[in-house]
Curated annotation (Swiss-Prot):
InterPro entries linked: Formate_DH_maturation_HycH
NCBIfam families: PRK15084.1
Protein name per its UniProtKB record: Formate hydrogenlyase maturation protein HycH
Top-level division of the source organism's lineage: Bacteria
Species this protein is from: Escherichia coli (strain K12)
Length: 136
């Protein structure tokens, strides 16, 4: 049995409906998309980064011990999944950027990919990441 950690990124949102939305109501639809899942909003997530379990643990161990960023990323082993949203971007971006100097080339590649995803969230606040531990 192999284990891995998958970072899935929000790729799009849509409302589950069969009828076309009248133009007059389109602003309500946009507002509903912005606030979340109250009107049948469906999030579509796509896998953007996959790490073997043991290598994920070694990667997050490069973050400063006791730091908020490390505690956040340790939520995956503790809870099985975490969500990374706009509120976590500055903290995680700074921590992973700082840790790159002590990382292996593979870890640096993952950090670069994660930093790119964090940049996407910074540019579009509705984007988020779901990070999950998966067992095959």
């Amino acid at each position: 049995m192999s284990e891995k950690v998958v970072f899935s990124q929000l790729s799009r949102k849509f409302i589950d409906e069969n009828d076309a939305t009248p133009a007059e109501a389109q602003q309500v639809v946009y507002y509903s998309l912005a606030i979340g899942h109250h009107l049948g909003v469906i999030d579509c997530l796509e896998a953007a980064l996959t790490c073997p379990w043991d290598e994920y643990l070694a990667w997050i161990a490069t973050l400063e011990a006791g730091s908020e960023a490390r505690r956040k990323m340790e939520g995956v082993p503790k809870y099985g999944e975490i969500v990374i949203d706009i509120n976590h971007v500055p903290m995680l971006a700074n921590a992973f950027d700082k840790a790159r100097a002590a990382q292996t080339s593979q870890q640096q590649e993952w950090s670069t990919m994660l930093l790119s995803m964090l940049h996407d969230i910074h540019q579009e606040n509705a984007i988020y990441l779901m990070v999950r531990r998966l067992r095959d």
